[in-house]
Amino acid sequence: MRPALRQRMQIVTKCGIKLVSPQRPGHAIKSYDTSAAHVRASVEASLRALRTDHIDLLLIHRPDALMDPRELAEVCAQLRTEGKVAHVGVSNHMPSQLALLHQHVPVVTNQIELSPLCLNALSDGTLD
């Protein structure tokens, strides 16, 4: 990517879901994974695919019931120190999940699913 073009962009990408596809033969089932190894591998893959040296906002996509907030905080801090990730956010977390994670990771945003076709966030506690 040309540096002049990159400077005019904010790159936001997600990690934390192992999708099933022909490009991912090691993923037998769709699952969530916020382990340090998976987050780091996802960031490195995004950097290569996007041909950039850093991500402006990394979103942890969907809550992971097996998440270790301290492990996630450590890898996020390392990625920030390395200059690979500027900010960390989450996607589709309930307020209690966001509060737990925020104790360990400086989360800057929570992207929620809300559209004319999906109004659940207005009544399911997401906006509490």
Where are the regions a protein language model picked out?
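Beta/alpha (TIM)-barrel catalytic core signal, keyed to glycine-rich beta->alpha loops juxtaposed to Asp/Glu
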Residues: P63-D128
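N-terminal binding-site loop/beta-alpha segment at the start of enzyme catalytic domains
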Residues: M1-K14, D53
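Active-site mouth loops of central-metabolism enzymes
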Residues: R24-R40, H61, L66-M67
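Structured loop/turn residues at beta-strand edges in well-structured enzyme cores
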Residues: Q7, A41, L50-D53, G83, ...
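Short, acidic/polar
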Residues: Y32-R51, E71, N92-L100, L122
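Conserved, mostly hydrophobic/aromatic
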Residues: I11, S46, I55, V88, ...
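N-terminal small/glycine-rich loop or linker at the start of catalytic domains
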Residues: V12-K30, H54, L59
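Active-site groove signature of glycoside hydrolases
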Residues: L47-L66
